[in-house]
């Protein structure tokens, strides 16, 4: 072969190789960038959601949570349905995000330098700052911390693989003496509960998580902010450029339309923040508010065979007998009905006192009838009230758990021991309906019975008969 032919062959060979490599790279990029098209074609957006109040949980009338609602909005924008995989801890959520079939991971995740090295974050949708919360008894013994220096000697526990553990490690490098423990066993909410019961002294949580939980734990106190405000974002599947670009565009629309502001107000702006045990105010409202609605309560009580004092007490627990009451979750009226529940009950105007009272009575009647037949007497009403608060599914889960623990699943005395366990990962991860604020349901029923007792003692009702 002549030299010229050899040279030409070599050039052709390398040119062909370069073109093949370039075409392969372009094709590879097209495949990687087609995640958005694949989602639309399959009709499903596969997401990981942290099972927590700030993110996703099953409420009394279905799925709830700020990030769940936001993802549902994005799925609607794409014209697909959400396919949800739940995680019980942030560490578990991060592990699940590595599954190539998962498109988005949502777990109130703070964008940190360390995380951005490993994960592909989408656009930011929320800001929060980390806060140290401690048991209030530390105020009494002079050990309550005011800054990172004063954490020395305290029992501080935070979640493993969280931004909180990164914050502590960063502070240690700066010379702060913080003897913190990192755990993958407990969720953030479980650690808050441990602070409340003083199993540990302090933990670190995001400001939005503190806002959601401070109402339920009377012994936790905000100590100080331990970080500046930082951005939170979803983790996207790798090389999802088209998905990320579409998300930026959608998020801009959500912000401009006011939908984001409405969602934040829905979950984090507390229009009602009641002191449920303010008996002095309760006595006052028996005289000033109850008479306006007394006839409606009595008529509904007769129609649905529900004790009048229990129905009136339920309404006070829900709204303080304020017909215009609106809660952070969007429920409203004297009986605090959701829009979906109101529609199901035939209630057209939730702030109309008569409609709300009869709708709430009908809803409670449905709960009573849905409680297992083996639950009898006074307990039947208590089970129904718990279901009114947290949902029938979670009450059924608690009964199943009670049975597993060798307790009487049809006894309120035993069920109230089990309901708080629905917020503990080792229990709720095995149950059909997942995480629930079972402790809140117990307090809810107890409060209603406190009010009911006061009403009865004031001769509002001479005797109580149960269905």
From Swiss-Prot:
Top EC class, one word: lyase
Reactions that this protein is recorded to catalyse: Exolytic cleavage of the (1->4)-beta-glycosidic linkage between N-acetylmuramic acid (MurNAc) and N-acetylglucosamine (GlcNAc) residues in peptidoglycan, from either the reducing or the non-reducing ends of the peptidoglycan chains, with concomitant formation of a 1,6-anhydrobond in the MurNAc residue
Keywords of this entry: Cell outer membrane, Cell wall biogenesis/degradation, Lyase, Membrane, Signal
Name of a matching Pfam family: SLT
GO terms classed as biological process: cell wall organization; peptidoglycan catabolic process
Domain notes: The N-terminal domain does not have lytic activity and probably modulates enzymatic activity. The C-terminal domain is the catalytic active domain.
InterPro entries for the chain: Lysozyme-like_dom_sf, MltF, Solute-binding_3/MltF_N, Transglyc_AS, Transglycosylase_SLT_dom_1
Major localization listed first in the record, in broad terms: membrane
Subcellular location: Cell outer membrane
Protein name as annotated: Membrane-bound lytic murein transglycosylase F
Enzyme Commission designation: 4.2.2.n1
Topology in membrane: Peripheral membrane protein
Family: In the N-terminal section; belongs to the bacterial solute-binding protein 3 family. In the C-terminal section; belongs to the transglycosylase Slt family.
Keyword Transport annotated: no
GO cellular component, one term: cell outer membrane
Signal peptide interval: 1-15
Biological source species: Sulfurimonas denitrificans (strain ATCC 33889 / DSM 1251)
Annotated segments matching region Non-LT domain: 16-271
Catalytic site positions: 318
């Amino acid at each position: 072969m002549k030299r010229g032919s050899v040279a030409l062959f070599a050039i052709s060979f390398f040119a062909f190789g370069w073109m093949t490599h370039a075409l392969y790279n372009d094709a590879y990029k097209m495949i990687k960038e087609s995640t958005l098209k694949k989602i639309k074609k399959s009709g499903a957006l596969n997401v990981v959601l942290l099972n927590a109040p700030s993110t996703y949980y099953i409420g009394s009338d279905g799925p709830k949570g700020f990030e769940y609602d936001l993802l549902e909005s994005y799925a609607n924008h794409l014209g697909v349905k959400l396919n949800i995989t739940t995680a019980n801890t942030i560490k578990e959520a991060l592990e699940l995000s590595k599954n190539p079939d998962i498109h988005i991971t949502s777990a109130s995740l703070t964008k940190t330098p360390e995380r951005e090295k490993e994960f592909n974050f989408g656009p930011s949708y929320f800001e929060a700052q980390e806060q140290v919360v401690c048991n209030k008894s530390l105020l009494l013994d002079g050990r309550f911390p005011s800054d990172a220096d004063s954490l020395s000697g305290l029992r501080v526990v935070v979640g493993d693989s969280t931004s909180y553990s990164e914050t502590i490690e960063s502070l240690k490098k700066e010379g702060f003496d913080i003897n913190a423990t990192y755990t993958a066993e407990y969720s953030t909410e479980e650690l808050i509960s441990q602070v409340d019961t003083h199993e540990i002294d302090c933990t670190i949580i995001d400001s939005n998580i503190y806002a959601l939980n401070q109402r339920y734990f009377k012994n936790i106190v905000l100590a100080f902010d331990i970080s500046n405000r930082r951005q939170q974002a979803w983790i996207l599947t790798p090389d999802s450029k088209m998905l990320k670009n579409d998300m930026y565009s959608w998020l801009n629309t959500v912000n401009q339309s006011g939908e984001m502001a409405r969602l934040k107000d829905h979950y984090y702006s507390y229009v009602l923040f009641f002191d449920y045990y303010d008996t002095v105010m309760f006595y006052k409202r028996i005289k000033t508010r109850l008479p306006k609605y007394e006839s409606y309560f009595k008529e509904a009580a007769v129609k649905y065979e529900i004790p009048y004092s229990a129905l009136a007490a339920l309404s006070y627990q829900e709204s303080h007998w304020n017909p215009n009451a609106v809660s952070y979750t969007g429920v409203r009226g004297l009986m605090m009905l959701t829009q979906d529940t109101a529609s199901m009950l035939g209630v057209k105007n939730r702030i109309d006192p008569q409609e709300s009272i009869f709708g709430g009575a009908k809803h409670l009647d449905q709960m009573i009838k849905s409680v297992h037949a083996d639950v009898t007497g006074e307990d039947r009403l208590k089970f129904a009230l718990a279901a009114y608060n947290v949902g029938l599914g979670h009450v059924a889960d608690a009964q199943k758990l009670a049975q597993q623990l060798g307790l009487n699943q049809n006894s309120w005395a035993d069920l109230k021991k089990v309901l708080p366990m629905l917020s503990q990962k080792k229990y709720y991860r095995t149950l059909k309906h997942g995480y629930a604020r079972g402790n809140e349901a117990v307090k809810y029923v107890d409060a209603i019975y406190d009010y009911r007792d006061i009403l009865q003692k004031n001769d509002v009702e001479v005797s109580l008969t149960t269905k």
